[in-house]
């Protein structure tokens, strides 16, 4: 839902094109969500059908995004690197006097990585108000509940203490997403983060949390293709 909103309503990249230096830039720090991005790019005619239908197959789309494919702005690797990348791209745009915003989606499990907090400090110090982070707060990481691995605590207070403007919304509700982006668009001189409370697998009955949590507490659909 968040990626659909960004490409269809929020960003200028579809209008300007991926080679235009004035474009808004989006990428996900948690690259395992690439199929969702591929679906949006396919719907926009950016990824061809023959490639879209070969996810994780030889000659097809990779399980994590790769810049060899049109429309992919950044690769993903070790978790926790996305905000740092976003900081650098935002700084480069300012240095080159180019317009355009930078949007980064992160996972909640990623915030067990310390690099995120280094990036939060740096972005606030530089008042990078064109950097917008969306935290996909679905409370599941890889195959377990986040709070069973490391409880993240009060995220709003943590982000605010680093100097970020923080908003929270239902990340599966387009009207809530619209209101939140409208609000943060007015904020100047501070980077922004949206804590988007989402339900993993929303809308697909057998994938939707908590239906897909097995008896051993493992979430089944972190990767792989549906079997229903």
Indicate residue ranges for each PLM-predicted region.
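A short alpha/beta connector and helix-capping loop motif
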Residues: 113-138, 193-195
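Generic beta-sheet signal
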Residues: 24-26, 100-104, 131, 190-198
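Short secondary-structure boundary/capping segments
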Residues: 44, 148-151, 208-214
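Conserved thiamine diphosphate
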Residues: 97-100, 147-180
């Amino acid at each position: 839902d968040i990626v659909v909103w960004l490409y269809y309503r929020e960003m200028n990249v579809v209008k300007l094109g991926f080679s235009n230096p004035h474009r808004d830039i989006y990428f996900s720090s948690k690259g395992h969500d690439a199929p969702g991005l591929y679906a949006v790019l396919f719907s926009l005619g950016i990824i061809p059908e023959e490639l879209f239908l070969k996810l994780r197959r030889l000659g097809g789309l990779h399980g994590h995004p790769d810049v060899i494919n049109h429309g992919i702005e950044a690769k993903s690797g070790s978790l926790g690197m996305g905000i740092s990348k976003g900081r650098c791209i935002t700084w480069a745009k300012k240095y080159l006097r180019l317009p355009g915003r930078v949007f980064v989606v992160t996972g909640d499990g990623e915030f067990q990585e310390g690099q995120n907090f280094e990036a939060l400090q740096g972005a606030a110090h530089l008042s990078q108000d064109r950097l917008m982070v969306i935290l996909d707060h679905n409370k599941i990481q890889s195959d377990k509940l986040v709070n069973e691995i490391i409880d993240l605590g009060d995220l709003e207070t943590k982000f605010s203490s680093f100097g970020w403007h923080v908003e929270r919304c239902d990340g599966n509700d387009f009207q809530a997403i619209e209101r939140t982006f409208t609000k943060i668009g007015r904020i100047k001189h501070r980077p922004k983060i949206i804590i988007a409370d989402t339900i993993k697998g929303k809308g697909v009955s057998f994938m939707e949390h908590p239906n897909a949590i097995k008896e051993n507490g493992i979430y089944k659909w972190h990767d792989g293709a549906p079997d229903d």
